[in-house]
Amino acid sequence: MLLSLIVTFLGAFLTLLFMRPIAQKIGLVDKPNFRKRHQGAIPLIGGVSLFVGNLCFYLLEWEQMRLPTLYLFSIFVLLVIGMIDDRFDISPFLRAGIQAILAILMIDLGNLYLDHLGQILGPFQLTLGSIGLIITVLATIAAINAFNMIDGIDGLLGGLSSVAFVSIGILLIKDNQLDLAYWSFALIIAILPYFMMNLGIPFGQKFKVFMGDAGSTLIGFTIIWILLLSTQGKGHPMNPVTALWIIAIPLIDMIAIMYRRLRKGKSPFRPDRLHVHHLMMRAGLTSRQAFLLITFAAAICATIGILGEIFYINEWLMFAGFILLFFMYSYSITRAWRITRWIRRMRRRAKRIHNKG
């Protein structure tokens, strides 16, 4: 087991070192613009690193993995499409179409789909029937794009995905599904080299890398894959509503932002600077402070989900809490300028009090 984790880490880490000059040579880099305020052209190779690390783990633990060929094929397609998008910018509708095809393959060949939503509406199981197939496709696209869209500041994608994988792993251990739990923690090991270099650890900003669409879509797909394995079928280790709490921050942020864009008559896929991390930085927080605060909030949400499972809290109550959280978040987004102005005022007041002291 330890050998697999070591090889996973080394595979991901060495891929970053190997791919840096190649990415710069072929133009697989992220250049600053009106939305992206980083310095210089940053290699978009985190996705390749994650894929290689994940592949190393799969090859060493092949017999323990579920549907390995289908999963590896799916993430390879996402990797290739993501790299093409990172280099040339392809249509978001084309990307969504490919994601839908992969979801259909997951349903047809892997028999992974949303059959029920648990008891989110009362003391009865909400069975979906054939409509569950459509909802599965939509949920797959949503999960992929939620993690893709939240990747806006250093460390955030690595932090949020690690929170999700740790939370899933804990619940899987509780249910004695050690193979899936082991993989969940191995995914964190595969992300770790990117996470460190994205934050400038240990080589500084000179070796900084970004995940890119290739990596963020791979993470989103992997999370929905594990969640489907964990929430559906008999004896599932977690309820579907718990999955909402585990990925609450990226999911709510995506839905709220897309709704706001549609309400303004814009494309839901049109980039802007209205995500939660942008608003926090506008309020005066640094990029590092925003990353830590959002990751902490995600950890709290995931903890609520875990505690709901451990203490058998009614699913409809957990769902009601999630809906309340969503509306509170949406309300804050629509009044972002007031909130950011109030936060800046409080920070200035606190600074004056500190200086007087």
Curated annotation (Swiss-Prot):
Keywords: Cell inner membrane, Cell membrane, Glycosyltransferase, Lipopolysaccharide biosynthesis, Magnesium, Manganese, Membrane, Transferase, Transmembrane, Transmembrane helix. The gene is wecA. It is a multi-pass membrane protein. GO terms for molecular function: glycosyltransferase activity; magnesium ion binding; manganese ion binding; phosphotransferase activity, for other substituted phosphate groups; UDP-N-acetylglucosamine-undecaprenyl-phosphate N-acetylglucosaminephosphotransferase activity. This is Undecaprenyl-phosphate alpha-N-acetylglucosaminyl 1-phosphate transferase. Pathway: Bacterial outer membrane biogenesis; LPS O-antigen biosynthesis. It comes from the Bacteria. Its cofactor is Mg(2+); Mn(2+).
